[in-house]
């Protein structure tokens, strides 16, 4: 069984021209391109939680991405230790030490994992999920919109590092970014439906029915096909499999597999979401100890020994008036999740980057899901958050229609030029790309000018 990474994963769509005395490895170049991109800088003006108010403490998408990168590099380091191989050795009935020697070389470098974590949110539009839903609704007959798909599009096409290949990142970096290796209009049937509300005033359409599916845009299929060229036909077919068979025409499907690098990035993102977003919500008073009791009860019913032993003390520190005690609790929780990570075998892939993933044990994953659910129920679905997101939805839907009514007059010069040059089928995508790249404040400022 081959467990070596093929050098083809370091290739780029356009071969880099060598620069004098530049000895950086490929993934360090990727990291630099992402860090120096306008899209990455824009994350500082996109809020992670919208209802926390004007408080210097709260996280933006940028600080969130930096924290995800730190957690991601810590997960990679943990995956090198022998205890991370225990479950895999049992799963494969092989010697743990031999597996450790064989598989450590598959792990991403710090440059690579940080590249993925820095880039994972750069395609997300203003106003969080509200903005995503609004753009998906406005693009419903033209391929839809989804934040992760926009990230891939930005990296491979939009960011002006090259004329037509975006940042021109390595194949392995792009593979690690793809969380859902399928096409959006395949995973979701919503783009084919013609519902009566399509002729209604878009400001009052129930946007909850237009949360996007998961996949890449059909416009970006050529780059996706280039990305998957190193895979065998069998691996390509397996990689695009869904978790379930569609039982209802309206059902949104999710793919089953992701690369090793992507599994590490996604786990780091989940930990940051479940723990650090909770910290923000506690500090600014969005959640209190009384609301936490339901989560505390669920946590005490989890079979995790560490949680059983420490959750009462963790709870006391989380809701303490002493900031250092809260930070101590947050650090303990993050450490608990990081040190629990382990290798797992995904399926019978020929490609080793797809054959293995990072995973939490079931009892630890259950704990993380409780944290994530609490943040979702009491922070994301908080009425103040939802009102802000709804306002964002209305702003983006109205602004989209305004731009579409007279694009050559109202779009910025370069965007208007791209709109003129685009095919009839792609003109809406040009407007969508422009709006998806806005920060919250910029979107509001432009809207007020119209």
From Swiss-Prot:
> Record's family?
Belongs to the dGTPase family. Type 2 subfamily.
What PANTHER family does this protein map onto?
Answer: DEOXYGUANOSINETRIPHOSPHATE TRIPHOSPHOHYDROLASE-LIKE PROTEIN 2, DEOXYNUCLEOSIDE TRIPHOSPHATE TRIPHOSPHOHYDROLASE
The cross-references to InterPro entries, in alphabetical order and at most eight, read: dGTPase, dGTPase-like, dNTPase_2, HD/PDEase_dom, HD_domain, PHydrolase_assoc_dom
The UniProt keyword set, sorted, is: Hydrolase
Please name the GO terms of the biological process aspect recorded for this protein, alphabetically: dGTP catabolic process
The HD domain, residue ranges: 61-201
Molecular functions per Gene Ontology: dGTPase activity
Recorded protein name is Deoxyguanosinetriphosphate triphosphohydrolase-like protein
**Which Pfam family, any one of them, does this sequence belong to?**
HD
Fetch the SUPFAM superfamilies from UniProt: HD-domain/PDEase-like
